[in-house]
């Protein structure tokens, strides 16, 4: 029986969606799902929810729950990671210390001071998981949803030989958004998308085989469209291609927007994310708001006479189904660059189309990106490379240098100011950074 392990199972919406996504495939209705989390209360509640779903849908799946990661991993075929080290207590200084210095992050989980420190907290756990997998399930496929995606996957590939792929929903989300914007049914759209996580590019976007970029550019002139997606449309105008991640995210990865109150206001004025108003530190506030909601959200679901279950567009379950059943599918995955994008560094983490079937994940070589797009990607890859080196060597100087290279931080602060800010972040997050003690 196929065994699928969730590490960090205590996420209500994500665990519920991914559980049902997996069980919605007939070939996966009798798998073993092992839920693992360090929080016994959350784990118990997610286990109840999982058992309720299996019973309601009359499936033959077996549900296990454990606090012991090694027990969960033993004999596994697929590992899905979805956790955050340090929780809200660690996320607060990621946002608030840079904000004190004038570095205004909207999300702070991918690049910049927040992204680098989130990665440094996560790296020791990733290494430990990789070591356990090498011993207990060396042939398993590791499906990672933990951010910062590019740094995490690059690090995993540096410290282990475990098969892995990093997944995000920005490609499918933006491709659908563009189709809706131009009035096209999604089943009539084809595209080529490649780059790095949160900064991949729609190199082609076609409607019934015809280039749809002229339509996209025309729609972007509409003031109502523009105010919802300011940063991405400005990047389209300047560099010629549409980027995958949202404007509030994208505005953190380049030096052009978040150093000016006028531009920050433009980006945030009418934008929303998951039906929430966008503002500085918005995701941190969402975490605060949700901190006490976990139990109530699960109880609300369990109290319903019938759970409404629909398949999401996340890639995770499609990958598992394709490997188990042999039905091929195409995803956009974050994988090691082995000649896939020739003008980005070998070994870095790139996001490219991948064919998935019974043989596993096979990334598609893309060739060279347009030079201006590769140049933008490299500004982020430089930060990632130094952060990964810091995690491997435990040398603090690489952390300072990574954040000195960050496009947003370097647009706002001097080198001495960056050093002071990073030192303060080290002090605030010391308990989650054992490798630097």
Regions found by a protein language model. Name each.
Residues 2-30:
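N-terminal Rossmann-like dinucleotide-binding module
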Residues 31, 87-88:
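Short glycine-rich, flexible loops that bind phosphorylated cofactors or substrates
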Residues 89-158:
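Rossmann-fold NAD(P)-binding glycine/threonine-rich loop
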Residues 129-202, 206:
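Internal, well-ordered domain-core segments that constitute the primary functional module
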Residues 27-51:
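NAD(P)-binding Rossmann-fold cofactor-contacting core
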Residues 62-75:
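Short acidic low-complexity segments
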Residues 183-437:
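Long, compositionally biased stretches enriched for glycine and/or charged residues
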Residues 74, 80-81, 144:
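Redox-cofactor binding/interface segments in oxidoreductases and associated redox assembly factors
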């Amino acid at each position: 029986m196929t065994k699928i392990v969730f590490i960090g199972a205590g996420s209500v919406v994500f665990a519920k969606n991914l559980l049902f996504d997996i069980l919605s495939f007939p070939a996966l209705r009798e798998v073993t799902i092992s839920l693992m989390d360090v929080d016994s209360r959350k784990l118990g509640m997610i286990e109840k929810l999982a058992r309720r779903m299996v019973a309601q849908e009359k499936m033959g799946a077996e549900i296990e729950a454990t606090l012991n990661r090694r027990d969960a991993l033993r004999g596994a075929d697929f590992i899905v990671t979805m956790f955050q080290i340090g929780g809200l207590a660690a996320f607060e200084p990621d946002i608030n210390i840079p904000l004190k210095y004038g570095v205004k992050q909207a999300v702070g989980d991918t690049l910049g001071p927040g992204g680098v420190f989130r990665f440094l907290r996560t790296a020791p756990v990733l290494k430990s998981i990789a070591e356990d997998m090498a011993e207990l399930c060396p042939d398993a496929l590791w499906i990672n949803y933990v951010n910062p995606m590019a740094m995490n996957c690059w690090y995993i590939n540096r410290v282990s030989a475990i098969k892995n792929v990093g997944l995000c929903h920005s490609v499918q989300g933006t491709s659908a958004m563009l189709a809706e914007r131009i009035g096209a049914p999604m089943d009539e759209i084809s595209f080529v998308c490649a780059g790095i996580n949160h900064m991949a590019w729609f190199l082609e976007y076609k409607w019934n085989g015809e280039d749809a970029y002229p339509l996209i550019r025309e729609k972007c002139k509409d003031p109502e469209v523009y105010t919802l997606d300011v940063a991405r449309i400005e990047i389209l105008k300047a560099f010629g291609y549409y980027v995958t991640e949202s404007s509030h995210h994208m505005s953190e990865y380049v030096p052009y927007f978040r150093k000016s109150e006028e531009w920050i206001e433009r980006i945030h004025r009418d934008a929303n994310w998951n039906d929430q108003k966008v503002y500085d530190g918005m995701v941190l506030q969402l975490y605060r708001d949700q901190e006490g909601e976990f139990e109530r959200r699960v109880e609300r679901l369990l109290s319903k006479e019938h759970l409404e279950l629909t398949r999401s567009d996340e890639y995770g379950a499609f990958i598992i189904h394709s490997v188990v059943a042999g039905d091929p599918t195409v995803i956009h995955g974050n994988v090691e660059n082995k000649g896939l994008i020739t003008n980005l560094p070998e070994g870095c983490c790139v996001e490219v189309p991948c064919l998935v079937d019974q043989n596993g994940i096979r990334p598609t070589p893309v060739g060279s990106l347009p030079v201006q797009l590769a140049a933008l990607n490299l500004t982020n890859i430089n930060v990632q490379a130094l952060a990964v080196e810091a995690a491997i060597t435990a040398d603090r100087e690489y952390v300072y240098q990574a954040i000195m290279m960050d496009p947003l931080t370097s647009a706002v602060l001097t080198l001495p100011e960056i050093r002071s800010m990073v030192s303060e972040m080290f002090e605030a997050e010391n308990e989650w950074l054992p490798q630097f003690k």
